[in-house]
Structure formats: structure tokens, C-alpha cells
Amino acid sequence: MASVFLPALGGVAVCGGTHGNELSGVYLVQEMERQRKEKGDGVWPIPVTTVLSNPRAVKECRRYIDTDMNRCFSRDTLSTPITDSSPYEVRRAQELNNQLGPKESTGAIDMICDLHNTTSNMGLTLIHYTTSDWATLHICKYLQTKITKVPVRVMVLDVPYSDAYSLESVSKHGFSIEVGPQPHGVVRADIYVIMKEAVDLTIDWIHKFNSGTVFEGGDVEAFKIIKSVDYPRDPVTRSLNAAVHPQLQDRDFCLLKRGDPLFLSFSGETVKYEEEEPLHPLFINECAYYEKGIAFHLAKRMRLTIPAVQVQKD
């Protein structure tokens, strides 16, 4: 593939607390704000905006107050008129869109890095929306090269930005960082350190790119979600009647084949994988997905070829 010249990136917004009980991002944003107060903006080589996304939920150490804010950034929700009955998170999403966007406009911030934790054994997972955002994919490739403490994986949702519903979709480029396993309402030092390294390396890549470094092309392994799987439920009460099978628990990104165990019913029976196509489970037994009726996602592994990139000179 031919080299691609891209405009310089004006900076990055690092956002934590979009879910108020995912504490690595909350404390990392607070630490970055402390460093800025102590050392000034020169503490980073590029402009960095820090945002505590959902302050009311952070204060109460809850995922959200009224509704999941990370589902409030679609074009339709951002354009919904605000009334007295509007959920807090819809109001806050529109505030953030005004601050960091507007979404799909030339005035939107160049990059958002939104910080999340998961109770699933996902390691460090980078989530974004397209297979053709070369800047974001190069950052993912850079992190995969530099971080060795945990596996670094890329998850692509591949939907139009207008339909994209999470905070990072407000920016021209952007991705969310998921690090786990970590219980909600808890901060683990090892998970915090991994998240901080990912943010530091993102800032480092942007600085090098803006300074003229040529980043060679290559392949990036990614996972694209195909479907979601609910827990087995009682047909009348809809209550769970099985849990994730011990042989599947904590094995996010493994390859599921027909006949592999998925669930263990509370009466002792094993529910097996019956799909013909082998797929990879993600976000296995994520605490926050119980209310969404999701035991795990199933994804297909894909290989994306990306071109060399360098900054476009004036």
C-alpha cells in the first residue's frame, strides 16, 4: 500500500469516569490533572485535555445515574431536545459534545481516548469504530509493539460514526481503552499501571507523528463482534438458570469450537457451543452486562492491512 499523508493531530482528550465505578480511569484523570496543576501544560509534549466524564456517577461510585452514558453519543441522542425529564447522562453527553465536538464536525477535537475497566479477563483491549481510520489503527499497532505486560488486542465495531454511541465517536479519531479484570468500585495497581502506560504511549505516538516520524505499514490483528449471547434463562420468570462454565470463565479471546462448554446450569447440566463457525468470546461474564442480557460477545478474528503514515506538511 502507498504511504498516506494525514493532518497533524491537535491533541487528545483523555476521559475517565464515563462509567463512574470504573476507577482506573477516574484516578488516572485525577492524577493527570494534579500533574498539570503542579508542572503546567508542558508536562506533555502535545495539548492534552482531561475530562471526568460522569462526575455525579463518580461521586456515587455507580456505573451511571439514570442511563448508560456510553450509549448516549449517537447522532439521534445528541440531537434530542433536553426537557425536565431528560436523563442526567443524556444532558451530560450533550455537554461533552459541545465541549469536545460537535460530533462529525470540523471543529471536533482530533482524538479522544476514553478509559474503561471490565470485570472480564480482557487484558488491554482497544475498541474503535472503523477499519480505515489509519491514525487510530497505527496507535493500536504501536501499543501492541510497546506493551509487553499483557496481551494488547483490537476490537472493531465497524459502524457509521453517526450511529456510533460511545464517547470517543465525538472526536475525528478515537478509541476506548478497556483494561481488566478489575472489580467495579475497586482500583488495582497493576491494572492502573497498564492503563497509564497505554495513555502515555498514545501521547508519545501523537507527538512523534506530529514531529515527522514515518510509521511503517503492516498488519493489525483485530476482532469484530458478530453477535451477543445471553445466559440461559427460565422461560417464564426470565431469571438465570445457568452460569458461565468454569472451562470458559476467564478465557476471553479463546477460540470456541462446536461442543465446547459455555454454561453450567444450576442443576448441573452443561450447555455447549452449537455454532458451526468457530468464534472468539469477549467480555465473558462482564458484571455490567447482566442488565443488558449479555453473557459474552462472539467475535471473528480478522487481519487489517494498514499503510505507512506520516504527517502532512503545510
From Swiss-Prot:
EC numbers on record: 3.5.1.114
Keywords: Cell membrane, Cytoplasm, Hydrolase, Membrane, Metal-binding, Zinc
Binding-site residues for Zn(2+), renumbered to this chain: 19, 22, 116
Sites where the protein binds substrate: 63, 70-71, 178, 289
Subcellular location: Apical cell membrane; Cytoplasm
GO cellular component: apical plasma membrane; cytosol
InterPro entries in UniProt: AspA/AstE_fam (IPR050178), Aspartoacylase (IPR016708), AstE_AspA_cat (IPR055438), Aste_AspA_hybrid_dom (IPR007036)
Requisite cofactors: Zn(2+)
Subunit (UniProt): Homotetramer.
Family of the protein in this entry: Belongs to the AspA/AstE family. Aspartoacylase subfamily.
Record protein name field: N-acyl-aromatic-L-amino acid amidohydrolase (carboxylate-forming) B
Organism expressing this protein natively: Danio rerio
